[in-house]
From Swiss-Prot:
Probable transporter. This is Probable transporter MCH1. Its main location: membrane. It comes from the Eukaryota. Glycans are attached at residue 278. Pfam families: MFS_1. It is found in: Vacuole membrane. GO terms for cellular component: fungal-type vacuole membrane. GO terms for molecular function: transmembrane transporter activity.
């Protein structure tokens, strides 16, 4: 299959190159990838479906949370495999995955709603595939951007991450349109059908844009095939696999600094995910601030931090190591946890982590195997979210008016994570990575 995929991708690139100059083609591919990220976050709108699931389809909240949990598993636990496939066969394969899993899943969901089916298993399977498709489209776009602009890793990584962060805000506004509502609740049949057709179009566009990365891969790996060489004979196996991919990935897995950094990410992102998931309960038991406003503030702060830190990390990397930017982001997060209700500080820290961490990973282990390396790190949000959310739930159930113990614990965990980051940096410094 890899030969045929490479052949199709190379044909698309060759045809487009006759119509558009290479530099302009790269710009178009970059913009399409950003657009893909901008609409990739439909799964982040799951909370908007809850009332329709409960009131229209009669699902219990336990059943609804089972569906949500399966979507998270689909998103996070498949990322290491998706990353390895992207490095081996190119991000175009992930774009195809997004079409294969998004469209049938949303169409089946639409059908289940139209028949008033309460099939929890059906919804669980579909949303698990939707989570997988979300990661496929997002990762394909992220890797495409990173490979098109390898000299500006911070900006190339922060822009798609920023667009993905905005996708929830954009989707929430779109779903306010009367077209998507019936009897003052979301018409899930219409919503799911809309997303199925949307992702068919976006998936095809993403496949075209990610095919252009082949040009960058050939230049990066020194592959300059003769025009008369048959495209299907360019390579006998993985046509886009970086040099020594398997050995480098094994070295990454055996690298103590990788595990140290992973632990730090779990201790960092766990409190942030838990805060975001339980913001309604936190506000209820503290200052009672307006939930929609606080959600908007956190989302805007996170998005702004992703974009700002992406630019800042690129232009300051010659003078200041990105590790110190990460330390600042962690300190901001500690302050946010100690304040308990500061959506701004927690949003800045949350967005900053998802910008600085992948940039550091790309700098230390190489941008050409970033799919495998950063994909492996994506188990951290799943583990961290479960650990700290369960801890919050137990604390809130036992003593709803004394959440200070929870926040002291999360702040302490983030301080410990900062120590782990510095330990990893000490290892990198000894290897010669003084500024990156």
């Amino acid at each position: 299959m890899h030969k045929h995929l490479h052949h199709v991708s190379h044909t698309i690139k060759s045809y487009l190159s006759t119509l558009i100059a290479l530099e302009n083609l790269k710009v178009v591919a970059f913009l399409i990838s950003l657009l893909s990220c901008l609409v990739a976050g439909s799964i982040l709108l799951f909370t908007l479906y809850t009332s329709s699931f409960h009131e229209v389809l009669g699902l219990s909240y336990l059943q609804i949370n089972m569906i949500s949990s399966l979507s998270a598993l689909g998103m996070y636990f498949c990322l290491p495999v998706l990353g390895y496939l992207a490095d081996s066969y190119g991000p175009a394969l992930l774009s195809l995955f997004s079409i294969w899993f998004f469209c049938p899943s949303y169409f089946v969901n639409s059908y289940l709603v139209s028949t008033q089916s309460g099939s929890v298993i059906g919804f669980c399977v579909c949303f698990c595939f939707i989570g997988l498709a979300t990661s496929s489209l997002y990762f394909s776009s992220l890797i495409t951007c990173a490979r098109i602009c390898p000299d500006h890793k911070g900006l190339a990584i922060s822009l798609p991450i920023t667009c993905y962060g905005l996708s929830a805000l954009l989707g929430a506004q779109i779903l306010k349109l009367p077209y998507f509502h019936r009897h003052d609740v979301l018409d899930l049949e219409v919503v799911f059908s809309f997303f199925a057709w949307l992702y068919l179009v976006v998936g095809i566009a993403s496949f075209v844009s990610s095919s252009i990365v082949i040009v960058e891969s050939e230049l990066l790996f020194g592959v300059t095939p003769d025009e008369e060489t048959a495209l299907l004979e360019l390579t006998p196996t993985r046509s886009l696999e970086p040099p020594n991919h398997r050995q480098r990935f094994v070295s990454f897995v055996k690298d103590p600094s990788a595990w140290i950094l992973l632990v730090s990410l779990i201790l960092n992102i766990g409190p942030m995910e838990s805060y975001q998931n339980n913001l309604s309960s936190i506000l209820k038991h503290t200052n009672g601030a307006d939930l929609p406003n606080q959600v908007s503030i956190m989302a805007a702060s996170s998005t702004g931090a992703r974009l700002l830190l992406g630019v800042l990390s690129d232009y300051s990397s010659k003078y200041v190591c990105r590790v110190w930017l990460l330390v600042v982001v962690i300190v901001v997060g500690v302050a946010g946890q100690m304040s308990e209700t500061s959506a701004i500080l927690n949003g800045v820290s949350y967005g900053g982590m998802f910008t600085i961490y992948p940039t550091i990973v790309a700098s230390i282990w190489g941008i050409d195997i970033m799919g495998s390396t950063w994909g492996s790190f994506m188990v951290a949000p799943a583990l961290g979210s479960v650990i700290f959310s369960m801890f919050y739930g137990r604390n809130a159930d036992s003593c709803s008016d004394c959440l200070s113990h929870y926040f002291y614990t999360t702040a302490g965990a983030m301080i410990v994570s900062c120590i782990f980051v510095l330990l990893a940096w000490k290892i990198w410094y000894a290897r010669g990575f003084t500024r990156f």
